Amino acid sequence: MASALDDPALQRHFKGHKDAVTCVDFSPDSKQLASSSADACVMIWNFKPQSRAYKYPGHKEAVTCVQFSPSGHLVASSSKDRTVRLWAPNIKGESTVLKAHTAVVRCVNFSSDGQTFITASDDKSIKAWNLHRQRFLFSLTQHTNWVRCARFSPDGRLIASCSDDKTVRIWDLTNRLCINTFVDYKGHSNYVDFNQMGTCVASAGADSTVKVWDIRMNKLLQHYQVHNAGVSSLSFHPSGNYLLTASSDGTLKILDLLEGRLIYTLHGHQGPVLSVTFSKSGDQFASGATDAQVLVWKTNFDKYSVKEIVKLQQKRTCPEAPPHLNDIYPRTPHLHSSSGHSIEINPMCEVADTQTFDPPIINVGANLPYCRRTKAVHTLNKHVRNDNYPTPPVAFSYTEGQKEHPLVEEQGVLPPSLSNTLEQIVDQLNVLTQTVSILEHRLTLTEDKLKECLENQQKTSAHASESD
């Protein structure tokens, strides 16, 4: 059993939302925390002592998801109002609006290079967008029901998604095809994510299960039934050794993936927990729930730092490479039962009260005059489908001593002629890439057939020799 010093501890709690907290996300430098809520607001919490929190009203309905860009300069939010907003996480709170889908937008996620982001919606589609040009790229449409979540792999080559059609799908972005499907007949998944190596995905089931799949072998590696209600969210520790889960039963669970067992059960929220996430360094994690609170925890239980674990992984003689399309083939799944016991931690009683006073909250963009649409926003609206949906102009606050700056740099807008030429080149490259992929696949089939023919020839020769 771990010592008390190794147990997770509640560090801070933030109160500012007026309704359920639907999503939480750390900034890349872990100096800020973003949260979204059913109160239709996004909030940015600053960890610096005595700093103010920013509240961004703008969405017309509940905000379903929020995420920092890899650079930390933007925050994306999705909403039931069918839009996605891109915010500057500062006191000015400028935002750009994208009419993204024809139904509720459930999820938004950035690629690791920050060039692309994806959205998932109740319109049964996943859409990819270019961030800097704010241009719609393509849709993935093989799900047959609401898409709850979509996440990039660490290398940006794959997307994992889960839907109310009771499937978890793996998509190859090169071909824009679904290359693998995991079916769960007991219920749909609410959330899905890749581990840090990109070799496994974990799903949070509405049937209260957590499953970890090897996407190279198409095999169920681990199956946990540790919650008493649906699992709403999960997050891999950066080391890849632990998995944090949140559930409607009001608890957070921490799973040791190396030993395949539950090690901690955390009680802190007064109601269903809707979102959890580790910080980039892994030394903190945050949770949000229907009690409108955001809790920030100190990890403590990971005895190795992320840097040490990365060094250990680099020393391996045969590091695991990311999966290739031809590496993924069907296998019969098996269950992995959890073992061991949990350590109950109740922040109200057993953990020292390290909570800070609620920071002052600044309402950014509320009841402010609208400004004229920027060129970037106007350019965006030309390329987004369903333009008949009215897009509000960008609202921002005026603060003395601060210069106005556009959310997206104007220098990123190219002349139409050059833009069309580049698009044609990109389309041609995509065709070439698909052609090469098809040729590789055919070559593989040909090699397999040739190998089979050679084996048959050897068998025939052997039989002929025996007959003689």
Swiss-Prot record:
One Gene Ontology CC term in the entry: centriole
Assigned keywords, A-Z: Cilium biogenesis/degradation, Coiled coil, Cytoplasm, Cytoskeleton, Repeat, WD repeat
Function recorded in the entry: Plays an important role in centriole assembly and/or stability and ciliogenesis. Involved in early steps of centriole duplication, as well as in the later steps of centriole length control.
Annotated PANTHER family: POC1 CENTRIOLAR PROTEIN HOMOLOG B, WD REPEAT-CONTAINING PROTEIN 55
Protein name: POC1 centriolar protein homolog B
GO terms under biological process: centriole replication; cilium assembly
Tissues where this protein is expressed: Highly expressed in ovary and, at low levels, in testis.
First and last residues of every WD repeat: 16-55, 58-97, 100-139, 142-181, 184-223, 226-265, 268-307
UniProt subunit comment: Interacts with pat.
Claim: Transferase is one of the keywords in the record: no
Source species: Xenopus laevis (African clawed frog)
Gene name, Swiss-Prot/TrEMBL: poc1b
Coiled-coil blocks: 420-459
Protein family membership: Belongs to the WD repeat POC1 family.
SMART domains per record: WD40
Subcellular location: Cytoplasm, Cytoskeleton, Microtubule organizing center, Centrosome, Centriole
Keyword Cytoplasm (UniProt): yes
Main location: cytoplasm
